[in-house]
Design a protein with these regions (language model features):
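Hydrophobic transmembrane alpha-helices of multi-pass solute transporters/permeases
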Residues: 2-131, 137-566
């Protein structure tokens, strides 16, 4: 006979305690979540990344072609847009975690995304000669320019709610309280990135070719169609999803309010004695892993003397959550050393390829932006090797369930990123030397007799760096933030890339100004045969090396949140 206790245990195993299904009742493990739901969401991401990179991967060619911008101005514009597009997810994640929830935020963001892509397609139809590739046409009117950039930033706004929430929603399909599902969640981040890269590869191979060889308007319209497909696919999977339980009550249930209150109360207790603080800590029994440098937050465990009647002290769990967020800041700052070099493949890597020999067969040339597909190919090849071969080997050596800790994985990618910049600098030096040998310094439209395949190593190495650093950052920031703020966690990883792009844009503008612009010996002269991208790559290699050393020093003292370790 089954006892009441056994019945309760069976019920707990059958249902996910922290999630509900689409009807709002407790989610069953057997028919919700896990890989069945995750593959639906991964499919949504594949379609969305196809749409995004259908625009982003060849944007610099559109700016220097139909819009008639200089190389430096176009690179700065691409970096600025890319930076803002990856910073805005902080806002989208805030809206999701504090108000709408992830599912509703994704729906609203997708509609804005589709609208932006539709306007972008319309703007390309209205620009004369917009189907030409690298040939700079007469500058379009201010109105058309305004429509184009309005559409572009509308896409960025749409992505801000879509990007962090879709991945967090996918990871939510695995219950971290179940050992098997917790292990599956770690693999989810690997397969998520592999599938996403497949969508990017498809966009680069298909859309870029159409944009260069046929029509920019048609090339922008295809991503719009794929974004519509993404939205439809997401809605179709709704009955299989697990949704986080929404907490009810007063304003204290808002995670942002609770964490902000920790700082407010701590600062209202500035003169709390050490003995009194120790007493409060012992009574509250906060985590012993809490670093001593952040003990000032524990002052919020005591009600301030001048507090209003009825005001209560903060809970120890809220103090731990606030402490965890602060301790992420140094790690986040050091990842900028990876984000700045990462921004270059959308701009200068592509412009290098424009000047080189691109003939595959007689009469057939490869679009320079198409080489970006090599990043995705290296990811698609290496992720299964990493997940199925290297992780078990590393696990047997390190005794860590994930093989490499998340921070070690990020560090390996940062080293590979620095090496990528070294190789890029050497290849660019060779290209400039070849141009000089053949008397092409003053002939920017001439093809330098050096194959575009010389760029392959830097693209492949960047892909390997991505597998380590970007996937590591996704898992790290998702797992190390409080459970209720996991959309914010993934937005933090994106914001690092966004700030890196903005810093890259600023760095380019400052260096271009300092070295004289197109009229002088600018490192970013529109005539790349007179430019010095090699100097810029060497500078980024040094910055990457310094950033890695700083990251290594900081990561040595980092203590993982025990509840989230895999």
């Amino acid at each position: 006979m089954t006892t009441c206790g056994e019945t309760s245990l069976l019920k707990e195993e059958e249902y996910v305690t922290d999630a509900v299904d689409h009807r709002g009742i407790s989610a069953r493990r057997s028919n919700t979540g896990r890989w069945r739901a995750a593959w639906f969401i991964i499919g949504v991401e594949v379609a969305e990344r196809f749409a995004y990179y259908g625009i982003a991967s060849n944007l610099i060619s559109y700016l220097t072609g139909p819009l008639g911008q200089s190389t430096a101005a176009a690179a700065a514009n691409v970096n600025a847009w890319s930076g803002i597009a990856t910073l805005l997810p902080l806002l989208g994640a805030f809206v999701a975690d504090a108000f709408l929830g992830r599912y509703r935020t994704i729906i609203v963001a997708s509609l804005i995304y589709v609208l932006g892509l539709a306007f972008l397609t319309l703007s390309a139809f209205m620009i004369p000669n917009s189907d030409e590739g690298e040939v700079t046409s007469s500058s379009p009117s201010s109105l058309l320019n305004a429509l184009f950039f309005f559409s572009l930033y509308l896409v960025a706004i749409g992505q801000s709610g879509h990007k962090p929430c879709v991945q967090a929603f996918g990871a939510d399909q695995f219950d971290e309280k179940d050992p098997q599902e917790k292990s599956d969640r770690s693999s989810f981040f690997n397969w998520w990135y592999l599938s996403m890269s497949a969508g990017i590869c498809l966009a680069i191979l298909v859309v870029v070719y159409i944009q260069q060889e046929f029509s920019w308007a048609f090339g922008f319209g295809i991503p719009c169609v794929f974004m519509v497909i993404s939205l439809v696919l997401f809605v179709l999977g709704r009955i299989s999803y697990r949704y986080s339980k929404k907490r009810h009550g007063d304003e204290e249930t808002n995670p942002f309010t609770r964490i902000a209150r920790v700082f407010f109360v701590a600062f209202k207790n500035p003169r709390l004695s050490s003995s009194e603080l120790c007493r409060v800590e012992l009574e509250a029994n906060p985590s012993q892993d809490s670093p001593k440098k952040l003990r000032f937050l524990n002052k919020s465990l005591l009600v301030p003397n001048d507090s209003a009647e009825g005001e209560s002290a903060c809970k120890s769990k809220d103090v731990e959550d606030a402490t965890a967020l602060i301790r992420l800041i140094p790690v986040w700052l050091t990842t900028l050393a990876y984000a700045i070099p990462y921004a270059q493949y959308l701009t200068f890597f592509t412009k290098q390829g424009v000047t080189m020999e691109r003939t595959i067969f007689p009469g057939v040339k490869i679009p320079p932006a198409s080489l970006q597909v090599l990043i995705g190919i290296s990811i698609v090849i290496f992720v299964p090797i990493y997940d199925r071969v290297l992780v078990p080997i590393a696990r047997s050596i390190t005794k860590d369930p994930c093989g490499l800790t998340m921070l070690r994985r990020i560090g390996v990618g940062m080293v590979l990123s620095a090496l990528t910049m070294v190789i890029a600098a050497l290849v660019e030096s060779k290209r400039l030397e070849t141009a000089k040998e053949h008397g092409l310094i003053d002939q920017p439209q001439a093809t330098v007799p050096m194959s575009i395949w010389w760029l392959i190593p830097q693209y492949l190495l960047l892909g390997l760096a991505d597998v380590h650093t970007l996937v590591g950052m996704q898992e790290f920031f998702y797992s190390q933030v409080p459970t209720e703020l996991r959309s914010i966690g993934l937005a933090l990883y994106l914001s690092a890339l966004g700030v890196g792009s903005l810093l890259s844009s600023l760095l380019i503008s400052v260096i271009d100004l300092a070295t004289g612009g197109d009229a002088g010996n600018s490192w970013f002269n529109s005539n790349l045969n007179k430019a010095h991208l090699d100097y810029f790559y060497w500078l980024l290699a040094v910055l990457s090396a310094v950033g890695f050393l700083t990251f290594w020093f900081i990561s040595r003292s980092y203590i993982y949140r025990q509840v989230d370790q895999v």
